[in-house]
């Protein structure tokens, strides 16, 4: 009997040892051998970069360069790549365009050839979003249709698209105008008393565009939607911290201060949105007419999709899906337009001749009357200016995808698990595409449209390109056109003496040390 027990104990110990060794081998393969195998394959195809460092990759080096780049402002010019992406810039300068960096254990190649960029953005099923390599808590913010793939993405995009038709955008214009009118009236009163009015425009436009999205998405004012906005801002800061860390699987489940706070914020936002949505759904089921805002259009479109699919349970979006899309409306809807208006104002302050051209065009079209939808879309100079601002200061500085299986890209075979980065902010400065003045603010390059400016290359990506082009790009551009037109009707503006040029990126490209601009009321 003792012999039997001893044999059993040995068998159990051997089994445990084998399991531990198997687990250790899998971890070692995940953390070392797989990255090294991918590195070897990339080098064999002519890609160059730093050798892989266990788990951390280039994160320490990148973090140090990033910290150094942001430690001081720069001269006012548009050569912002060394400040926004110093490590990528250094890597490409050192190893060439066919290079790679390490995001922890994940290799990331840089793609800068127009035909390869087109291939990546055309085949979105092969080149997918890379949120899975980050802490899962990142998805509390980076959610909705922009984060989905495959059938779920197709379904969500189909349901959401009706909210962004030209007809719907036209119906939103009065709500846009009310928000801008209220802000500009306050500015006018201050300017009349003081002769001018100094404004830190980025936080001001941030609040303004949040007010706009609250009205057009939920039919509520900024005061009512303000809590959601403030919570999303806090969640955004915490999300950035997560994305900068090397993610270790399981880390998101630990009760760290950051993890706990992110979960608390997400629950609070979700509960508030659920209350709004359930109230709307109850009214629709009672036969009441739907409201003509983004949420109303989304809910009606969702009901139609469910009916079209034979009232199947998974035929449309669930309440949780709708909540995630509302978060995306709030975050993307206000953030993109806020930064676009900020950089447009700063660049027009530095280029007063273009400010005057745009003002003359606006006054000729509308005088001092409220801008109308049809003529707003035919403001040529204003459109050219916005396109040029989006070229020099795109909302996001890169588009990064990941391949989940070996994938042919041109003459290369990209190994499974590799990220593919399209460095937007660099592509927008390529002299071979944009000419010798690529670093200069020159809206005339868009006089014959984007296709002519890019020589029909896929190298202008402020809102991405292809099947996954941003659904809200016309929403952002219309709001920016209206805002700029209404400001030009009432004010001249110049950057304040205190302004220092320091673009940096927190998901979007923002001014690091403030964005003070002086507004002077136009003579009647």
Swiss-Prot record:
One of its GO terms (biological process) is alkaloid metabolic process. Its cofactor is heme. Its EC number is 1.14.19.62. GO terms for cellular component: endoplasmic reticulum membrane. It is a single-pass membrane protein. Residues 1-11 are lumenal. Residues 33-524 are cytoplasmic. GO terms for molecular function: heme binding; iron ion binding; monooxygenase activity; oxidoreductase activity, acting on paired donors, with incorporation or reduction of molecular oxygen; secologanin synthase activity. Heme binds at residue 470. It is an enzyme of class 1 (oxidoreductase). Keywords: Alkaloid metabolism, Endoplasmic reticulum, Heme, Iron, Membrane, Metal-binding, Monooxygenase, Oxidoreductase, Transmembrane, Transmembrane helix. Upper and lower leaf epidermis. Its main location: endoplasmic reticulum. It catalyses: loganin + reduced [NADPH--hemoprotein reductase] + O2 = secologanin + oxidized [NADPH--hemoprotein reductase] + 2 H2O + H(+); secologanin + reduced [NADPH--hemoprotein reductase] + O2 = secoxyloganin + oxidized [NADPH--hemoprotein reductase] + H2O + 2 H(+). It is found in: Endoplasmic reticulum membrane. The chain crosses the membrane at residues 12-32. Pathway: Alkaloid biosynthesis; secologanin biosynthesis. Pfam families: p450. SUPFAM superfamilies: Cytochrome P450. Belongs to the cytochrome P450 family. Component of the seco-iridoid and derivatives monoterpenoid indole alkaloids (MIAs, e.g. secologanin) biosynthesis pathway. Catalyzes the conversion of loganin into secologanin. Catalyzes the conversion of secologanin into secoxyloganin. This is Secologanin synthase 1. It comes from Catharanthus roseus. The gene is SLS1.
